[in-house]
Amino acid sequence: MSYKENSFYQDILVSECFYVATKSKQLIGYEILGESRVCLWSDKTLAQPFLDAKGIDFDKVKKIDVDRFVTYELDNIFNEGDQVLVNPTTKSDGELVDVVKVSDELMSDLDSIRLKEFAKDVAKEDAVFGLSEKGAKQFALISDDEHQRPHIMPVWSIKSRAEKVRREDFDTLELVEIEGAVFDDWLDTLRDDDKAVAIDLKPGVVGTVVSAQKVIDQLAF
């Protein structure tokens, strides 16, 4: 079952975030079909009226970045087949969805969208930004040990995004700009060495990681 046509799915795809209610730092659920389900909302304004109407005590409604959730929290909180209640309101019971499946589908679509946007920006500006050790002639590689990805080259198509991540997560490295043609050559080497590319990472080092071949294919369009 695909969730692509659901309105909540499209909302999260655009905003790249969702909202949950917490009490003492624990996720709040609501009993439906005899079982308590964690509630989440694609629109923050839907949460409090529902919680108040149901008499559910909570500390706050918290914004969750979907990349950070999938990278650091999903596997620690949920198991395969677990369902969450999406967008319950005072007028609607909401939808029960498989949290792992919908997360996988969202990330697949986000990866595709980001890769296309990256390629479009690079074609327009003929510039790619990366991080480098002082004096080095190559972009730095990072590791994602948790997902067994030891060699990843983070790159950005927009300088301000790159600088924000550099400042918050890699302050010992320098921001470097190269031309698109140089990046094309580097991609061939990354592909031959079976290394990955991180596209427009967010602070916290979360976001889209794809094979070098996928980037090559997209830039060819």
Segment roles from a protein language model:
Residues 1-221:
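Conserved NAD+-utilizing ADP-ribose enzyme module
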